[in-house]
Amino acid sequence: MTGADPPSGTFHLFITSGMSDNHNREGYTPGKPWLAVALCVLALVSIAACRGKGAGAEQEDEAASHRFPDTLRVATLYSPTSYFLYRDEPMGYDYALLTQMAADKGVAVDLVVAPSLQKMVEMLDSGKVDLLAYEIPVTAEYRKKVHPCGPENLTYQVLVQPKKDKEKLITDVTELVGEDIYVEARSKYQYRLENLNEELGGGINIHVIDRDTLLTEDLISMVSDEQIPLTVVDNDIARINKTYYKDLDISMPLSFPQQSRWGVAPDHAWLADSIDRWFAQETPRRRQAELLKRYFELSKIDMGTFTLDLSKGHVSPFDHFFRESGRENGIDWRLMAAQGYHESRFNPDRVSWAGARGIMQIMPRTARAYNLDASRLAEPESNISTAAKIMRDLDRSLAKKVADPKERIKFVLAAYNGGIGHVYDAIALAAKYGKNPQVWNGNVEQALLMKANPEYYSDPVCRNGYFRGRETVAYVRGVMNFYETLKKKVT
């Protein structure tokens, strides 16, 4: 997770089939809004080898006359569902499906992250890309320039409300009369509520919040915290956010479903046919189900329990490993112990939704960068020792940006938890928007939260796109608070 000073201008980041172990190494340069990702280049796979039965003769003739490109040019957008960077590694539901399809077909992928949906469609229309790996609404407007293909998704708006006894839940639109509902200004949610309110004859109290003040994710969090009673979002966004909160109900739809799919150019129906044939196979269908569970169902917050007892001067059963690794790398072992508690509750066998493993929740690719086989991440000593080296390297890299060693600890923790690329972005945003780029509390932490807003993560100073910073900010605060407690009670 270490990195060099982020360079200016636009660049392309290429990643091989092994996903180069750049992460957490000196000199790693984080990604950018226009990002190219090169995947494995294996044998060229023809359409004939992938074709199934049942297509019309004309479609089969057309498919047989084309070969799947050896390099598939693909565009997508930063979003919590399609593509994002987490701990400096590319992730996302659509991204994962794309990489699996490319590996199965034995082709390379040149992936570009476009700045907007309109620009992405323009890239397809001008022939700059072959495929849009993003859920494009299947409407008459888009069908003029986009031929649908790939995974089918049905999106509809839902009411987000606190989970209550069944008799207290709102289960019918008529029950919205008299209720207060908060939504983003000038959003489709506002327009849907206004139409629904008109259909019901009025009575819904619609509170419109400007995006500069709060985002959809903020409103969902406020419902969970009971700061506001209700909000409205798309079901896929609701499902992802529900994995961060245990006390939400998202079961009530407020609109008709809208189909969305990937897309190719209208004159590339043969490519769409090949992609659809791949998705129709049993193995891809099973993988798709696994990815749906990973991104939309698995809890992001459930770490189990661990009973703390500091009365005897001990924090965990692994204190001797924390002490030794801390001493070898110049880190207070109590800081690392505080991390271990917040990362996994000291559970050596924990595996997160993102694949991070062990007490210190290290990503397998990061482990390999430090010459540790992923199979050994469940070993407490190896896991803690590697985490200490990561923290050491992060501190060295961030010393270029944050001079005060004590203040830098918070930046290092944020980089460990969310990725140094996003921390670099937050530092740049803080400097640009009048905050102190060398102070975490109230400054860079606020800039990190801004990276959930398209207006800011699309800013030229940001190189790593969308980031849900809420959990990382809470992580830094939680670790630092526990660390201060340990300094008073444990030597």
Predicted regions, residues:
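A ligand-binding cleft/hinge motif common to bilobed small-molecule-binding domains
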Residues: Q118, A133-K145, E194-N195, S221-F256, ...
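Catalytic and substrate-binding regions of cell-wall glycan-acting enzymes that process beta-1,4-linked
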Residues: E407-L486
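Extracytoplasmic small-molecule ligand-binding "clamshell" domains
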Residues: G54-K144, I206-L214, I275
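Extended ligand-binding regions for polar small-molecule ligands
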Residues: G92-D104, K163-Q190, F256-K300, G313-S316, ...
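Bilobed "Venus flytrap"/periplasmic-binding protein-like clamshell domains
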Residues: R73-S82, Y86-A103, P137, V158-L214, ...
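Periplasmic-binding protein-like
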Residues: T76-P80, G150-K166, D236-W278, S299-G304, ...
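Substrate-binding/active-site groove segments that recognize
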Residues: A185, D349-S375, S382-D393, V479
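Export/targeting segments at the very N-terminus of extracytoplasmic proteins
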Residues: E297-F346, E381-I384, L398-V402, T491
